[in-house]
Structure formats: C-alpha cells, structure tokens
C-alpha cells in the first residue's frame, strides 16, 4: 500500500511540477512587463522575453510580412486570377452604377464633396477657353485674304447666290416704287433735282402739260427694274464687288469690329453661365443616362482589367514604395505590452494550453518512472 501511495505521490508531484513549470515559462514570455529591481540589481528574466525584445519582434514581423506573406509573386498571382478579376469588375460595375443612377443634382453632389465654387470656376474657365480659341482663330485668319479664309464650298454658294440676290433686290425695289411711299420718295427726289434748275423745270413742264413728272417717271423706273438687262447689270456689279472683296485682307474687319467685341458677342450668344447652371441642375442620372450602358459594360471592365494588368507588372515597385515592412514595424512598436500579449494569446491560446498539459503529462510520466525505480531499488 505504501508503495502505491509513493508512486501516486511521485506521479502527482511530477505532473504538478511539469505543468506549473511550463505554465510559468509561458507566462515569463510576457511578464513582467517591466524590469524589476532589488536595490540597484535587476532581477534576472525581467522584463519578460516579448516585452524585452518587442522592437526586434516588430522588425522581424515587418520582414516576415514582406518576405513571406505579401510577396510580389503572391499579389501578382492574385491580381491575374480570373475569378478575382471577375469579382472586382462586378463590384466596380455595381458601385459605378450606383453613382450614375443617383437622382440628386450635380450641384448637390458637388456641394456634398465640398466643391462649392465649381459653377463659377467652370464658367470662368469655359469663357477663358472660348476667348483664347476665338483670339487664336482671328490671329490666324487675319493673315489671310477672304478668298483664302473662306472654304471653297462657301465661295460656290456665294457665287451661285449672287443672281438670286440681284433678283431679290430688284423685286424689293419694284415693290417699293409701286407703293405710295415709293412714289412719294421718287417725287421728292425729282423735286430736289429740279429745285436748283428752275428754267429746266419750266421747259419740262411745257412738254408734259398737266401730267406730273413723277407720273411719267414712276412707270419707267418700274419698267427699268423689271428688265433682264437690269438684273444682269446688277448681277455683274455684285460679282465684281465680290471679286474685289475676295482679294481684301480679313484683318480689315478689325477696323469695323474689334476682337474683344467679336469675342464678347459670341460669349453673349453662347450664354456660358446659363448653360453651366442648367447642366449642374440636372440629376446625375440625366447626365449619365446617354453613356451609362457604355460605361458600365465597356469602360469599367476595360479600366479594371488595364489597372490590374498594370498593377501586376508594377507590384514589386508598388510594394517597395509602400514600405510595408516599416509600416508593420511602426504599428507593432506602438502596441502596448498588454495588447501584444492579448494578440499573441488570441492566436496561440489553445496551443499554449496544450504545452502546459504536455508538461504535466511528462512530469507525471517522470513521476511514474521515479516510483518504479524506487520500487525496484527496495
């Protein structure tokens, strides 16, 4: 009975000592958190291993992440993985579609993004661009003649239109002189003509008798305006003037209208501020609807694919520029010892328990061996 009691005692003590020793060793990895002193002498094994080597641990963790976890090869494979690309494209399409189907106005969206002065800035920028383009256009065309400046099609249209213009002028002139206003104006012109020629008026009056001069002249004027020869004469005159104009410099226009006035007139016609305002008052959905399908189905997949291809080719330089090792090192260095302990224990808690149990098991087995040795020795 005493023999079995001795074996049980040695086994129990061995298990307790083995388990406690391993448990203590595990605790000493983290504790104490700070060095302990007796007088001026530092107590051995203080602080614990991990608090003491925290800076080295941070450096090694950073190296481990870069050299073994987030490697260029691993990230490159992920970026070129077909399933990953499909998932990313689908996600991008959903997110872009959410933005493009937003019913809020562009103005509201920009204000939400703290872009408050976009309307004023856009108006000023567009007006500036228009003015610059107009000035550049005029600067170039002022070196040309009208024949050089106008396209060949315009030349043809003007030359083909000259006979029609002649006919229109003569038609309007005929209608004018047939009217009472035209007759009155013609009468005044005749009176003014003869006013300084009194003797001539008396002579004409002797030939015409009681018929007024204007009654004789008006039909002749109308008859003259209706003749084909008159139309051809006016056409020839207009054609000659057109030929003269073609040889003149465009720059002569500046004597009548300044560049600034031309630019100002065009800006007034375009109404940039009003146009920009109307555009910003539209909803995002209204603006994007014409191109929504193209962007979702073509632009987004193409952009994501190109972006991933570029990322896969340049992943090494991207990682180098990110300095991931330094980021991990800095983050770990900022951890308190308690947080670092909790972090390690949350990962290795079960394994550390098994080590404690293993120590107790080994201690118990050693106790059994000791008990057997004592038994045989007796």
Curated annotation (Swiss-Prot):
GO cellular component annotations of the record: plasma membrane
Keywords of the record: Cell membrane, Membrane, Transmembrane, Transmembrane helix
Subcellular location field: Cell membrane
Chief site of localization: membrane
InterPro entries reported in the protein's UniProt record: DUF445, UCP032178
Transmembrane segments: 1-21, 357-377
Membrane topology category: Multi-pass membrane protein
Pfam families: DUF445
Entry superkingdom: Bacteria
SS bond list: none
Transmembrane listed as a keyword: yes
Recorded family membership: Belongs to the UPF0754 family.
Entry protein name: UPF0754 membrane protein BALH_0780
Organism the protein comes from: Bacillus thuringiensis (strain Al Hakam)
